[in-house]
């Protein structure tokens, strides 16, 4: 419904535009082109933190995940207004290792540091929690690679 209303509005705007982009009154939209007020609210239940974590761990633990799905998952996860739990990052790092994608491991760790923002205690905590996984998988942190000085 909203998409149709927006399309009608966009079509109406382009049909009224003259050759130089100026509006003229040669053709005014009829009542069908009026924008309708639509409320875009979710009617579903809220996802708990545990369900959110489980969903992302399951996503990254898929045995047949490919490089595109990995990057898509990382990009989506980074857009959230939160620092992912270490167990989600652990699953993502293991997926990177399965795909031999070292660059993505560094990118994930840099994104976690960036998402922590001014809260300087978060990133060291995450690295501390991930240290066994980092050692097991042979992954160096951006600081160990000297990327924090670049």
Curated annotation (Swiss-Prot):
Pathway field: Energy metabolism; oxidative phosphorylation
Membrane protein topology class: Peripheral membrane protein
Location in or out of the cell: Mitochondrion inner membrane
Keyword Manganese among UniProt keywords: no
PTM comment: In response to mitochondrial stress, the precursor protein is ubiquitinated by the SIFI complex in the cytoplasm before mitochondrial import, leading to its degradation. Within the SIFI complex, UBR4 initiates ubiquitin chain that are further elongated or branched by KCMF1.
Keywords, sorted A to Z: Acetylation, Heme, Iron, Membrane, Metal-binding, Mitochondrion, Mitochondrion inner membrane, Phosphoprotein, Transit peptide, Ubl conjugation
Gene Ontology annotations for the cellular component aspect, listed alphabetically: mitochondrial inner membrane; respiratory chain complex IV
Sequence motif: SIFI-degron, positions: 2-17
A molecular function GO annotation: metal ion binding
Family in the record: Belongs to the cytochrome c oxidase subunit 5A family.
UniProt-recorded name of the protein: Cytochrome c oxidase subunit 5A, mitochondrial
